[in-house]
């Protein structure tokens, strides 16, 4: 059975369409599994029945490449959208996986900050561009993969998002990177997007043989409590190999520990989102 078909078999009946939940996958520290999480969480959410749009906001375009979308296929990219040359709906391309779609990146994204200069609402370009997709599309999740730095692309992503999902590598300086990100979130809340939430923190590259991983997990769960997902993403060679083949790990090796962890994370994200919506609806009724 082809790997794509094997992943598709996981899918239950899709839930009724509703306004998309926009999550920015962000961490200002590099090498934490940010793009890997964006690719594989997006794939896993699609595998469990959600309709997902992944936006590659990193000029390196690793999320686009990791989903097997070659540069030659990127006719319209996020760059065209942010510059106002094309609507976001024209930039959406289907991947090989049912339920997973992509707005690809372009190296020209690295010049967006200079090109937009002092334009009004330059921090709202992505938010404005996504409004039609959020209002009329039937996506249940929009995931935005950001560059590992605080620049106009990251600010646009946070301004457009409902919440931030933070991948956190189980290493010594993990909390330092998380603290920096929380400061950025507070800055964005204060001036651009007061409703921005923390969706959750996911521990990545966890090695149960290493006492440091357990210590970092404990140190993060202490102050952040239930914000930290129960699911941890293990350090797994198959997860590392998959991008070089232009495939999410769930397609590359569905049965490996990394794939199973991302499926578990996707289910946890969906359950938490249902609980959040139920709580929000209850507040409105009061």
Where are these regions (language model features)?
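P-loop NTP-binding core
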Residues: 1-286
